[in-house]
């Protein structure tokens, strides 16, 4: 378009909010099987209900071993168990934690052009906590579905709405917000690491003129952010998954869950599912951030075309 480049016009808060939720849903569609494999590996060793596969208590071995076992035993659809709740989660969760990040960052810097790492970290913590408070029930349902053996006769839930109703009925209103504490901790860490690392890598690449503000820069920044996030957030993520999936009374708190893991399974338990976590977060970050950047530009271009008379 002559005289107009979408990248030259800062996207509005609404564009960021809608774009973040949409991009996160697209990323989830591509990477959901890896997330399901991660959940299965993380809860392995704590389940009180043995799965009848004929191979003893250890069912899953590695990322692709987990995926192939699930497909063989439960069918291909099992890899997308909980997808509906996952998409509900991203539309409410990512829209807040990613879409509002720049606005909250500007609030902390009071509009200053210089943005220090402290302001970035505070913005990441704030939007991460806000997103969890809003979207926690969708995360609980998603994890329960992913952990559930689709081939078993005794399914805990038979649909997304059934899961919301059953949890509220059997565990009370608080059951839908189970694990909010560890999830806020996890997402404060994830948000700070993911968004701040993406911010810093992208700024460094642009300031050093190694790359321009385009797809290769977005890809590199997103991949680096995914790796850093996985390394830092994995222990909290494992505790969060175990605690949210636990039966009522199994753990009295998230801390009790962490202590039980350390006592029974050792320190390595906190990095169970690390490879699928990295594959998922790395690929999720790449798809989400690249899509998000392109969506922002496309939406700003469409907005300009709509506002400009022919």
UniProtKB/Swiss-Prot annotation:
Pfam families: Mito_carr
Sequence segments annotated as region (Purine nucleotide binding): 277-299
Keywords annotated in UniProt: Membrane, Mitochondrion, Mitochondrion inner membrane, Repeat, Transmembrane, Transmembrane helix, Transport
Cellular location(s): Mitochondrion inner membrane
Membrane-crossing segments per the record: 11-32, 79-101, 121-137, 182-198, 216-235, 270-292
Topology relative to the membrane: Multi-pass membrane protein
Mitochondrion recorded as keyword: yes
Annotated function: Antiporter that exports dicarboxylate intermediates of the Krebs cycle in exchange for phosphate plus a proton across the inner membrane of mitochondria, a process driven by mitochondrial motive force with an overall impact on glycolysis, glutaminolysis and glutathione-dependent redox balance. Continuous export of oxaloacetate and related four-carbon dicarboxylates from mitochondrial matrix into the cytosol negatively regulates the oxidation of acetyl-CoA substrates via the Krebs cycle, lowering the ATP/ADP ratio and reactive oxygen species (ROS) production.
Protein name stated in the entry: Dicarboxylate carrier UCP2
Species of the source: Cyprinus carpio
């Amino acid at each position: 378009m002559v005289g107009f480049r979408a990248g030259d016009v800062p996207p509005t808060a609404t564009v960021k909010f809608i774009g973040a939720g949409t991009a996160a849903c697209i990323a989830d569609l591509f990477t959901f099987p890896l997330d399901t494999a991660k959940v299965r590996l993380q809860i392995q060793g704590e389940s009180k209900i043995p799965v009848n596969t004929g191979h003893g208590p250890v069912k899953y071995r590695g990322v692709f071993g987990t995926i192939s076992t699930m497909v063989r035993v439960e069918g291909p659809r099992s890899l997308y168990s909980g997808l509906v709740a996952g998409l509900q989660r991203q539309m409410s969760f990512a829209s807040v934690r990613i879409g509002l990040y720049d606005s909250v960052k500007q609030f902390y810097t009071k509009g200053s052009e210089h943005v220090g790492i402290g302001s970035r970290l505070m913005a990441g913590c704030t939007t991460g906590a806000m997103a969890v408070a809003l979207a926690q029930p969708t995360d609980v349902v998603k994890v329960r579905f992913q952990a559930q053996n689709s081939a078993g006769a005794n399914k805990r839930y038979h649909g997304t709405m059934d899961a919301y109703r059953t949890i509220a009925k059997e565990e009370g209103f608080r059951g839908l917000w189970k694990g909010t504490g560890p999830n806020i901790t996890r997402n404060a860490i994830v948000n700070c690491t993911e968004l701040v690392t993406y911010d810093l890598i992208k700024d460094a690449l642009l300031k050093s003129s190694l790359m321009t503000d385009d797809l290769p820069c977005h890809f590199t920044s997103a991949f680096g952010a995914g790796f850093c996030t996985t390394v830092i957030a994995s222990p909290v993520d494992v505790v969060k998954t175990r605690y949210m999936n636990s039966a009522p009374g199994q753990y009295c708190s998230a801390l009790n869950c962490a202590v039980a893991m350390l006592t029974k399974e050792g320190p390595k338990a906190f990095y169970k599912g690390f490879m699928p976590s990295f594959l998922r977060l790395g690929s999720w970050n790449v798809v989400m951030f690249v899509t998000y950047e392109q969506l922002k530009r496309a939406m700003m271009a469409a907005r300009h075309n709509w506002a400009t008379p022919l």
